[in-house]
């Protein structure tokens, strides 16, 4: 069994069962691999959680890079693409971004490696948004990026509890409104 396969299945379990309820034993059972063998690579639940979140983080980073290089989409489409990706996740009963929110709650110490990993992902998301907003030459891209990221984080938090497409739709609409408002301000319509 490949490491990525184990981590992928661990992520699915974490999304379904939550960080608190997922055990190393559950992962071993899900991947049909002896627990003792699994412990050679991940001695405890925290180790596999860290690796699974790091693996997810790498996947998200690759997705963002590919999106940035996609010349068929406008900057606006790229900014809103996360909501289409989240809709796809909801459709497949997957809630990966929520794990970073949950990880910060479960490991509140900012110095903890899992909390730091979640913070790095949050920072990378902000940088992605800020870069695209700067490309669009919106007024105060840092503030608009903070607003858009706050909407995204709120959406992920709601998904953690409700697992609802309606929350994704609402957040998508709000992000569109923030972007439209920023573009109007850029054009001098709101001065």
Curated annotation (Swiss-Prot):
It comes from the Bacteria. One of its GO terms (biological process) is negative regulation of DNA-templated transcription. Keywords: DNA-binding, Transcription, Transcription regulation. Residues 1-60 form the HTH tetR-type domain. GO terms for molecular function: DNA binding. NCBIfam families: PRK11640.1, TF_DicD_YjdC. PANTHER family: HTH-TYPE TRANSCRIPTIONAL REGULATOR YJDC, TRANSCRIPTIONAL REGULATORY PROTEIN. This is HTH-type transcriptional regulator YjdC. It comes from Escherichia coli (strain K12). The lineage of its organism: Bacteria, Pseudomonadati, Pseudomonadota, Gammaproteobacteria, Enterobacterales.
């Amino acid at each position: 069994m490949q490491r990525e396969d184990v981590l992928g299945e661990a992520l699915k379990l974490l999304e379904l069962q939550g960080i608190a309820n997922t055990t190393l034993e559950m992962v071993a059972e899900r991947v049909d691999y002896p627990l003792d063998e699994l412990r050679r690579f991940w001695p405890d639940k925290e180790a596999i959680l860290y690796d699974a979140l790091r693996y997810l983080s790498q996947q998200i980073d690759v997705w963002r890079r590919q999106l940035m290089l996609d010349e068929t989409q406008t900057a606006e489409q790229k900014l809103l693409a996360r909501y289409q990706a989240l809709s796809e996740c909801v459709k497949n009963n997957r809630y990966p971004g929520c794990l970073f929110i949950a990880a910060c709650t479960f490991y509140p110490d900012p110095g903890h490696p899992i909390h730091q990993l979640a913070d790095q992902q949050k920072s990378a998301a902000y940088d992605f948004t800020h870069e695209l907003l700067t490309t669009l030459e919106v007024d105060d891209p840092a503030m608009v990026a903070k607003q858009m990221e706050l909407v995204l984080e709120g959406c992920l938090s709601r998904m953690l509890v409700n697992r609802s497409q309606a929350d994704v739709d609402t957040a998508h609409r709000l992000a569109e409104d923030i972007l439209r408002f920023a573009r109007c301000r850029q054009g001098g319509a709101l001065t």
